[in-house]
Amino acid sequence: MRPIVKWDPQKEESIKEEYHKYGEAKPDLCRNLGTICSYCEKTFQDDRDLHVEHIQPKKYKDANGNYIYAHLETVWSNFLLSCSTCNGPDNKGNKNVILGKCHLPHLNNTFLSLCYKAGGVVEVNPALNGDSAANAHNLLQLIGLNKGPKDSSLKDKRWLIRSEKWDIAQRYLDKYRNRRTDVDTIIDLAKGYGCWSIWFSVFKGYDEVRKALIEQFPGTAKDCFDAANHYEPINRNPDNLNDPV
């Protein structure tokens, strides 16, 4: 999952700390992060297909029936972009999100949290342990990103999309190795097809491609990757001893 940096309302004049209606934040989110689902990384030509997603759901009710996040309904810091599947009732929906107990793409290096493989497989990074592994697992469960063909609804084709995009990326890796395509073409394909993490995974060892993927996708958290080590992911929160990811 692509780690992202959201614009700071204190530094970007066009960004409001709070909006009159949360839907008014969508153009700003799209300029900041691209017309891309912040979770499954599907790309959209039309931003009408994207939701302004409330990280802590506005309709979540606690045991006493209180909407404990209602005050965050129009607050910029509580927004990401999501497709209807990731934000749907079968996946994130109105699940409770406790900050610090679940990795999130604007707070953690979520490319380090998860591993992408052929066949549409997404798993918790086996190199993680302790709270880091638990919080990465919570992210996977929150979005339902690990659902495969046996446990996905007929409408949830995210695993199939990933599988298809993995195969496409592999084909273009072979072409790139044989100098039958170039970096610009790879980036154009990644932007058109989506699934940033798959392209970044498949092109491991090709620094010029990885560099372009980081730089040419708006909002990508550049500090989450080590340019001196083939743009491998690094901890985003090194001072957090319990969960540096």
Model-based region annotation:
Residues 29, 61-69, 127-134, 147-157:
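Intrinsically disordered, low-complexity coil segments
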Residues 88-91, 119, 171-174, 178:
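Short helix-capping and hinge/turn segments at secondary-structure transitions, especially at repeat
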Residues 42-81, 90-110, 114:
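Histidine-centered nuclease catalytic patch
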